[in-house]
Regions:
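N-terminal redox-cofactor-binding region of secreted/periplasmic oxidoreductases
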Residues: 1-562
Length: 562
């Protein structure tokens, strides 16, 4: 259930055994070979992830901390949170960043009860995923379904080159290979892209040869409405195709619907916290208090600036918006090295103003905020769940985010950065920014006019940035006043579409574990979860490659009879 990154891997691997009959269900559209939409293939992802045809449009989430000690407090505002609805899932619309996380992340998975998931056990599956076009050796795969590569500094735009100099002046070194040894430094971003075209999980794993297998059926535009049970045995799913309800039955059902929709399916089937299920009028099938709990994402804010004309991207070589990033250590007590990650964007949207704005996106990659949750609004399968991330609920996350704004705000004031940027300001991915980023003729006309004005006199540019682009606070405000900085960070922090951990793997004696280390849902039979839901903790990485690794490893477990 779910033809995203994990579902594409599973369909390919499980159908390789001719005696397995595999049905892949996906709510979104197909992306068959030769008919992949241009926006999906594009090296620049902004036109894909803001296309409403490729996402669940009614999904809203909260990101600010909700106080359970003050139930009368005004709830935080809800935000749009793009979740893919297309074959290939997130890999069809994401930023194509292909990294793995820290070895200590996976050792922590094992320590939290996911036996067999330490770094030494998962590295072979990361290598199995990839076909590295640049490097060989013990860290890299050469025969996988997903090509990975980097764009090296000689091809970076002037803004990215200047940022590299600023990083070095701050004491960080250049690292050629992000996915080799885990150490601090800046590097060319590793991307799942070949010859300036995205390679999604659907493109890589559901290739024409795989699609020709007699034992594999791919049913797109198919919405799963519920799970079918015979007692505690899951025996199939209910689905809607073209407005008509239908049922599919199978020996084993695998949920790969993502960390928001997979737990929602379990909850509607009566698997989850008993009190919440009763509140929703749902009969309790298996009381698993961890379903939907401890939701995580990586909190992020940005410090942006106007790019001087010579520093902007020249599209002759690449349409990529990100060329480099920095991994660094906060050095807070008890926190492992490489806990912070700052991406350098050389344009922030597809439109003319987006090409004039660059940013540091400051992300807490080793987050300790684990109080997010997914709950049902009702028992109706057509209602999106209530999703509360509670980002920055851990004080350590807040402190590191504030420190990041100070670091990179101050970096914008250095001579090397002032040679390529002007008018730096604190920024966030607000719904206002998102609305302007939607593809429309109106937005193009508005941003074309604004871009011409921004390239005009400096005084006019400053006025327009302060009145139309900024969210109220200046960089001076947040760098000189800690209360204003904290207020900005708490309000502006958003997730980066790395929802994870709502059906966590764990040990037999862990009451919050939803699945075992083979992905089997505890308390019932015939049902597994294989997606980012099962992560015991979100790794220090963009989550797509950890999901692909997880699907490869669990496919092996299923094929071996585990």
């Amino acid at each position: 259930m779910g033809g995203g990154s994990a579902g594409s891997v599973l369909a390919h691997r499980l159908s390789a055994r001719s005696h397995n009959k595999v049905l892949l269900l996906e709510a979104g559209q197909d992306t068959p070979h030769g008919k992949v939409p241009a926006a999906v293939l594009d090296s620049y992802p902004g036109t894909a992830y803001l296309n409403p045809n490729y996402t669940w449009n009614k999904l809203k989430v909260t990101t600010e901390v909700i106080s359970h000690n003050n139930p009368g407090a005004t709830p935080p505002p809800s935000r749009t949170y793009e979740q893919a609805r297309i074959l290939g899932g997130g890999s069809s619309i994401n930023g194509q960043l292909a990294n793995r996380g820290a070895p200590t992340d996976y050792d922590e998975w094992a320590d939290r009860g996911a036996a067999g998931w330490n770094w030494d056990n998962v590295l072979p599956y990361f290598k199995k995923v990839e076909r590295d076009m640049d490097f060989d050796g013990p860290w890299h795969g050469k025969e996988g379904r997903i090509p990975v590569r980097r764009i090296f500094p000689d091809l970076w735009p002037e803004h990215a080159k200047a940022v590299g100099k600023a990083f070095e002046q701050s004491g960080w070194k250049f690292i050629q290979d992000q996915n080799a040894e885990w150490e601090d430094g800046y590097f060319p971003i590793t991307i799942s892209n070949a010859y300036e075209r995205r390679v999604s999980a659907a493109i890589g794993y559901l290739d024409p040869g795989t699609r020709l297998r007699d034992n594999l059926t791919i049913s797109t535009d198919t919405i799963v409405s519920g799970l079918l049970f015979d007692g505690l045995q899951c025996v199939g799913v209910q689905a809607v195709i073209g407005g008509r309800p239908t049922e599919f039955r199978g020996r084993e059902i695998i949920l790969s619907s993502g960390a928001i929709h997979s737990p929602a399916h379990l909850l509607r089937a009566g698997i989850g916290p008993a009190a919440h299920l009763r509140d929703m009028g749902i009969e309790v099938r298996a009381a698993r208090p961890g379903v939907g709990q401890r939701l995580q994402d990586h909190p992020a804010v940005a410090v942006a600036a106007f790019l001087k004309p010579h520093a902007r991207i020249i599209h002759d070589y690449s349409r990529r918006h990100i060329y480099t990033a920095l991994r660094y250590s906060s050095n807070l007590p008890g926190i492992p090295a490489g806990d912070m990650f700052t991406v350098v964007t050389n344009k922030t949207s597809w439109h003319a103003v987006g090409e004039q704005i660059g940013s540091f996106i400051i992300t807490v990659y080793k987050t300790y905020s684990e109080t997010g949750q997914v709950r049902l609004r009702s028992a109706n399968w057509q209602d999106e769940p209530q999703v509360d991330f509670n980002l920055l609920s851990d004080q350590r996350d807040l402190e590191r985010m504030m420190d990041g704004v100070r670091r990179f705000g101050a970096m914008h004031l250095t001579p090397v950065m002032q040679s390529v940027t002007d008018n730096p300001f604190p920024a966030s991915y607000s719904d206002k920014v998102r609305q302007v980023g939607l593809l429309s003729r109106k937005n193009k006309l508005i941003t074309d006019a604004l871009a011409r004005a921004l390239d005009g006199p400096a005084a006019l540019r400053r006025y327009l940035i302060e009145t139309l682009v900024m969210e109220g606070l200046t960089l001076h405000d947040v760098l000189s006043d800690d209360d204003k900085l904290e207020g900005f960070v708490r309000k502006a922090a958003v997730g980066v579409w790395h929802a994870s951990c709502t059906c966590r793997m764990g040990a037999d004696d862990d009451p919050m574990a939803v699945t075992d280390p083979a992905g089997r849902v505890r308390g019932v039979a015939g049902l597994r979860v294989v997606d980012a839901s099962v992560f015991p903790v979100v790794p220090c990485a963009n989550t797509n490659f950890p999901v692909l690794m997880t699907a490869e490893k669990l496919a092996d477990a299923i094929l071996s009879g585990a």
